[in-house]
């Protein structure tokens, strides 16, 4: 399965605090794991705002993801346009872009976000941990 990990799941994976269901998916060699520059951007913004739950260095996280064979999914204008096709269930622009990317690329979005879980389509919900 091709999985795009949302920002929260990426942070938990990096910290080694994933819930068991999410951890099984992440360590399964049959799955291809993707991350988006959207998550790196979100972490950088929220870190600069002093959010204590985003205190990882985004450059170090990115390097660690690449070193652990995660695939970086570039953002395209097609992804930006796909955001407009999403129902207005969620106001978070980072999460909306992640979902648009997953839909456009045929990936499943792995998330612990209860609002993202309400969207139809390729969303896999796992408990936060």
What are these regions (language model features)?
Residues 97-129:
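Acidic, PIN/NYN-like endoribonuclease modules and their adjacent C-terminal/linker elements
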Residues 94:
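Acidic donor-binding loop at a coil-to-helix junction in glycosyltransferase catalytic cores
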Residues 9-10, 39, 79, 98, ...:
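Alpha-helix capping/helix-boundary segments
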Residues 61-88:
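Acidic catalytic patch
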